[in-house]
Regions:
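Flexible loop/hinge segments that line or gate small-molecule binding clefts
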Residues: 72-77, 109-139, 143
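Bacterial Sec-exported substrate-binding components of ABC uptake systems
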Residues: 2-4, 9, 15-52, 148-179, ...
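Extracytoplasmic ligand-binding site segments that recognize negatively charged/polar headgroups
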Residues: 124-139, 143, 172-197, 241-243
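A short, structured surface patch at a secondary-structure boundary
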Residues: 45-107, 119, 203-206
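His/Asp/Glu-enriched short active-site or ligand-binding loop at hydrolase and phosphoryl-transfer sites
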Residues: 191-217, 267
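Structured C-terminal subdomain patch of bacterial secreted/periplasmic proteins
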Residues: 109, 132-142, 151, 228, ...
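Short helices/loops that flank or line small-molecule/ion binding pockets
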Residues: 89-99, 116-117, 218-229
């Protein structure tokens, strides 16, 4: 019942997306995290200081308007990557690119500093839900003159995610899942964005009962994991830390885990697993493929 309701919620967002399909007319006001942001005309020199917003901008069709992205924006490869920091942005360094729009994910004094220089700033923070991720894509589409492109991206994600979720057999909808962030067992609970993605499938997160501080990102012990016996293991530390199904099998006691015995250990690209843009579909596809294994 829960999974069916969640699938319907994902599909229902298509109705909201239809309103964004029109070509953006300027000036336009975007209700962003930093308030109502007025964009007087279509931006032609955009600086993106967030890997996710960079992916969103290129996906909606605004790639040619982007003149610089931060050092962590590694996708798409055609993005103009620089040494700009998205975590500790410097207004003077950003201003050197003569932007008419700066998009970032973290609040801070740099917003006021850039606005003082006459530069429009749009804050699109980390999201908690897929609905919020869709909304950010729509906002970036509207802000850049690509409302129709954004609507197409969102609709494509909705359709693909619904299909992938439904591809997992009913008998696997309650699998116990462990999402690994680091080899020393830092993980994410159902209270996080990625945890809510697992809930779309109906999976049970083994970390939920161990998050005493309610941080959303507890560190588990090896003993706890062996006792929890996850049936699906997702390794989001494959790039940073070289983790794979092979390295997991070499861990003491892990050969007895259901996930290992059933070959339901999947290594995913760290960056794909940590972002909330269009490549979320790739992450869900990898998880669904592993969950379908008998």
């Amino acid at each position: 019942m829960l999974r069916a309701s969640l699938i319907l919620a994902v599909a229902a967002l298509a109705v909201a997306g239809a309103a964004s399909a029109r070509t953006t007319a300027f000036p336009i006001t975007i209700q962003a995290a930093n308030g109502d942001v007025v964009i007087s005309k279509q931006p032609t020199r955009i600086v993106s200081l967030s890997p996710t917003t960079t992916e969103d901008l290129f996906a909606v069709g605004a790639g040619k308007q982007v003149v610089a992205v931060d050092e962590d924006s590694d996708y798409p490869k055609s993005a103009p990557r620089t040494k700009l920091s998205g975590l500790s942005p410097n207004a003077e360094a950003i201003a050197q690119f003569r932007p008419d729009l700066v998009v970032l994910s973290y609040p801070g004094p740099v917003i006021a500093q850039l606005e003082k220089l006459g530069i429009t700033v749009l804050e699109e923070p980390a999201v908690d839900t897929i609905a919020q991720a869709y909304q950010e894509i729509r906002e970036l589409g509207a802000a850049t003159g690509h409302g129709a492109g954004a609507a197409k991206v969102v609709r494509g994600m909705e359709v693909k995610l619904t299909k992938l979720i439904r591809s997992v057999p009913k008998k696997h909808r309650h699998l116990r899942v462990y999402h690994e962030l680091t080899p020393d067992y830092y993980t994410a609970t159902s209270a996080t964005f990625i945890g809510r993605v697992y809930k779309l499938f109906g999976f049970r997160n083994v970390a939920d009962a161990a998050d005493a501080t309610h941080s959303g990102y507890p560190q588990l012990s090896g003993e706890y994991l062996l006792s929890a016996n996850p049936q699906l293991v997702v390794l989001a530390d494959s790039v940073c830390c070289g983790q794979s199904a092979k390295t997991v099998q070499a861990r003491a006691g892990w050969q007895q885990l259901d996930a290992v015995k059933r070959h339901r250990v999947v290594a995913v690209d760290d960056s794909v697993a940590s972002r909330w843009g269009p490549r979320l579909v790739d992450f869900v596809a990898a998880v669904a493929a592993a969950a379908r294994r008998v």
